[in-house]
Amino acid sequence: MRFIALLISFFALLKVISAISGVDISSASTIESFTCLKSAGYDFAIIRAYESLGQVDPNGPHSVYNARDAGIEYVDVYMFPCPTCGNGAGQAETMVNYLKGYNANYGMVWLDIEGPQYWMSQSENVAFFESLVAGLKAEGAHIGVYTSASQWEPIMGGYTGGSEFPLWYAHYDGNPSFSDFSPFNGWSTPSVKQYDDTGDSCGLGFDLNWYP
């Protein structure tokens, strides 16, 4: 019995050790900032590459470079689309091609779905989301979705089409675990959690994220 208890404790510890912490940013950065974050134990970064005004983020490619040059192993980007600007596929393709123009080396593209007040009717929102997805798929992007039940449901209603993609969800409880997660709209298990939005060190403001 004692052996079983020790074994359970070992696997629990192994899971904690294998989990990694990361940041997401929406501002300009430097290599020095990411080197500092790397030294502080952050191993992944998610960089804003498209702004909600309907334009690419000019800081995006350079922040991808900076994170890579600082030794951050996992670097993704996120897209904050402009629903009322229309042409989701065009927005997605513009962002991807802008990053390609800089030879920015990143993994996932996370679609940031939040702020119901900035969206349209639920049927229009679903169509716009599917257009974004089509544009990213046409460019060969690996897609994920950043949202939470409180944001997704007012925007998309009962639509479950987003659940074919990994979920990065936000809940600012300061707890780097999925113990708080409740399934919604087809997502039964999340991939990443944004658990704190008050990160401020190494010359950067950032959100804190956790990946098991």
Curated annotation (Swiss-Prot):
Q: Which UniProt keywords apply?
A: Antimicrobial, Bacteriolytic enzyme, Glycosidase, Hydrolase, Secreted, Signal
Q: Which domain of life is it from?
A: Eukaryota
User: Which class of enzymes does this protein belong to?
Assistant: hydrolase
Kindly provide the name given to this protein in its UniProt entry.
Answer: Probable GH family 25 lysozyme 2
Q: Does the record carry Protease as a key word?
A: no
Active-site residues per Swiss-Prot or TrEMBL entry: 24, 112, 114
Q: Which reaction does it catalyse?
A: Hydrolysis of (1->4)-beta-linkages between N-acetylmuramic acid and N-acetyl-D-glucosamine residues in a peptidoglycan and between N-acetyl-D-glucosamine residues in chitodextrins
Record InterPro entries: GH25_Enzymes (IPR051595), Glyco_hydro_25 (IPR002053), Glycoside_hydrolase_SF (IPR017853)
Q: Which residues form the signal peptide?
A: 1-19
Q: Which organism does this record belong to?
A: Dictyostelium discoideum
Q: Which family does it belong to?
A: Belongs to the glycosyl hydrolase 25 family.
Q: Which PANTHER family match?
A: LYSOZYME PROTEIN, LYSOZYME-RELATED
**Which BP terms in the Gene Ontology apply to this protein?**
cell wall macromolecule catabolic process; defense response to bacterium; killing of cells of another organism; peptidoglycan catabolic process; signal transduction
Question: What's a Pfam family in this record?
Answer: Glyco_hydro_25
MF GO annotations: lysozyme activity
